[in-house]
UniProtKB/Swiss-Prot annotation:
Component of a complex composed of SufB, SufC and SufD in a stoichiometric ratio of 1:2:1. Interacts with SufB. Interacts with SufD; the interaction enhances the ATPase activity of SufC. It is found in: Plastid, Apicoplast. Proteolytically cleaved. This is Iron-sulfur cluster assembly protein SufC.
Length: 347
């Protein structure tokens, strides 16, 4: 009975301390993986340890080595409490080196072992905005997910470095603390988690990592009054469950709100412009433009020229069958508009 209670409440706590739930199922490929998810751990444990006091080490436990339940629990807490000690920048790295460096990257699907990425090479420096374009199924979203650490994909060859660190060996929670942010193409609903609690837990995780004092509820609420206005959402969205009952456009704007709160260094936007009406599109584009500066970088996945006209990316990359087959400036977008992708394909 105690074991069952532990499992049930652990699930509830995990919902709070895990950030950025990802729906692993592909909406276009069917529903067979619909319920599979994974999370970017952001360690919101401290906010809830008073509520869930059972997580603390009980005083009467003596033989911990013989108690798997308590060993698992203490292992979880140890990982959470050491987040401020995580190294998120490689020795000797500075702004003269690429923020993100990818060399000959190959990746497969865990299920079926189908190779999706077939030799990606890419360098992104601080202050740059890069755009990935290509036909459906070319591997654009897969590249975004692999960088973020999606468990549905396995890297079989190649290198990914972020701030000089070997990103391949970094767990997803460390990638988040490093400053990597992914705005999902299909944001997941969390019906049991209030939006304001989710956002504050995420923010405090990053503040703890920077050895900063956690933000109080009152301070957070004051900050959110201004931040939520930027994305065109009313304050009532903060008291609603994360993305639950939101329209497609509201979900996308809520993703951008998370970006504003966390202030990541490397932002991956996976078709953030899809599902937005005209007004939301302009508003979201302006928010992204204003957020962009010399101390952050963007990787933008999109099909639409209109977004790029507003964001003005430094580089355009065209993907086809898991490879980047063409890179250049904005003139590539005009060529795609006029003659499509076939002009870049080798016969």
């Amino acid at each position: 009975m105690k074991r069952r209670k532990w499992l049930n409440i652990t699930w509830a706590v995990t919902i709070y301390i895990f950030f950025g739930m990802i729906n692993v199922s592909s909406y276009n490929e069917g529903r067979k993986r619909k319920n599979k998810m994974y999370s970017f751990v952001i360690n919101g444990y401290n906010e809830y340890k008073n509520k869930y006091s059972f997580l603390r080490k009980p005083k009467n436990v003596v033989h911990m080595e013989n108690n798997n339940f308590d060993m698992d629990r203490l292992s979880l807490l140890k990982n959470l409490e050491e987040e401020s000690k995580i190294i998120t920048e490689g020795e000797g790295w500075d702004k003269t080196h690429p923020l993100l460096e990818i060399k000959d990257l190959h990746a497969i699907e865990i299920e079926g072992e189908k190779e999706i990425l077939k030799g990606i090479n890419l360098e992104i420096y601080l202050g740059e905005k890069h755009t990935i374009m290509g036909r459906n199924g070319s591997g654009k979203s897969t590249l975004a997910k692999v960088i973020a650490g999606h468990p549905y994909y396995k890297i079989t060859k190649g290198i990914i470095k972020y701030k000089g660190l070997d990103l391949i060996n970094l767990p997803v929670n460390v990638r988040s603390l490093c400053g990597i942010f992914l705005a999902f193409q299909y944001p997941v609903e969390l019906p049991m988690v209030k939006n304001n609690e989710f956002l504050r837990a995420a923010l405090n995780s990053h503040r703890r990592h920077r050895n900063e004092e956690e933000i109080s509820v009152s301070e957070f609420n004051l900050m959110m009054i201004e931040e939520i206005k930027k994305v065109g959402l009313s304050s009532e969205f903060l008291d609603r469950p994360v993305n639950y009952g939101f329209s497609g456009g509201e979900k996308k704007r809520n993703e951008i709100l998370q970006m504003l709160i966390l202030k990541p260094t490397f932002c991956i936007l996976d078709e953030t412009d899809s599902g937005l009406d005209v007004d939301s599109f302009k508003l979201t584009s302006n928010v992204i433009t204003n957020f962009s500066n010399d101390n952050n970088s963007f990787l933008i996945v999109t099909h639409y020229k209109k977004l790029l006209e507003l964001l003005k990316p430094n580089f355009i990359h065209i993907m086809h069958q898991g490879k980047i087959i063409e890179s250049g400036d904005f003139s590539l977008v005009d060529k795609i508009e006029n003659k499509g992708y076939s002009q870049f394909l080798k016969e």
